[in-house]
Amino acid sequence: MSFMLALPKISLHGAGAIGDMVNLVANKQWGKALIVTDGQLVKLGLLDSLFTALKAHNMPYHLFDDVFPNPTEALVQKGYAAYQNAACDYIIAFGGGSPIDTAKAVKILTANPGPSTAYSGVGKVKNAGVPLVAINTTAGTAAEMTSNAVIIDSARQVKEVIIDPNIIPDIAVDDASVMLEIPAAVTAATGMDALTHAVEAYVSVGAHPLTDANALEAIRLINLWLPKAVDDGHNLEAREQMAFGQYLAGMAFNSAGLGLVHALAHQPGATHNLPHGVCNAILLPIIENFNRPSAVTRFARVAQAMGVDTKGMSDEAASREAINAIRKLSARVGIPSGFSKLGVTKADIEGWLDKALADPCAPCNPRTASRDEVRELYLEAL
């Protein structure tokens, strides 16, 4: 079996990594940066260290801080207009998945005709575009190092998933010092997103030895450190360990692919503007229990990675404990038990079925689902 690993050219980790990145970019003399971020992060002062470092090197930038959760094509077009009007030369994304995905889509438009959603699917971005630096503030989406971007087509009410090595950031930055003020609810949701990445990658039909190693270590780290990061956001060690865990999960799914959890989670996220990590967390134990008969031994290893003592257990029994461990972690960090608590009703489900089955994440799932089975999975998730 052949496989591909596509990663950022440079990855910087640890407290102070933002300063290291600015020193590096200063030597490259890329020109003027468009900083793509969320206005709330600016108000919280999380970008202050970036602004200070850029000014110290006399590096020009233009701030675009209009990003909102679940970015749309209209937002991407607005960001690209800001890039053009300010005569920028490269992009710095600062934030979680939404700012980084927005920046990736703007990067596409710097070298390819729009809209960015035209590149939904795998390997459709012909030209790489301008350099992109991605500074991650959550642990997380791993958007700072993956080939994925998710942009909503508002007219169709669908999340378009763009998967292409040409949108991988040139420089990925995981500086835990800017993660300390992230609220507990966001920490929980993004942490469960990272767990979903790791579990889906490990049981994916595209899994291979390199992704297996990364996925299992990611599961171990996230299970151990996510509750600590949720309980005390200023626990720097917990933030750093979660940053490592989510990055390893990104390395795994960036090559192995994802599965039905993401395929189904994209739909309520698009129609109800729900947090992506929460959608994943609600669906993860339900869909992996559906997948479990097709990957019993792998789910037994997931249980071990999540700290379950499987000594004396059969793989069948251990695989069931993996699902229980996922449920326990999700409840421990305060994830809602179902979509009905978030305003979703049975009437919403029918419009999601075909879109979920057509999602680019679905083909890597270890078990094929019919339309009726997808409906039942959604109903169970209510």
Segments (PLM) and residue ranges:
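Gly/Pro-rich interdomain helix-loop hinge
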Residues: T271-D348
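An N-terminal, well-structured beta->alpha segment
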Residues: M1-F64, A381
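C-terminal and late-domain segments of enzyme folds
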Residues: A184-L248, A252
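Short, amphipathic C-terminal "tail helix"
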Residues: T345-L382
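Glycine-rich phosphate/pyrophosphate-binding beta-alpha loops
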Residues: G140, Y247-N280, D359-P363
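A glycine/threonine-rich phosphate-anchoring loop and its flanking beta-alpha core
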Residues: A111-A207, R298-A305
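N-terminal small/polar loop signature for handling phosphorylated ligands or for N-terminal nucleophile
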Residues: V42-P115, G123, K228-R239
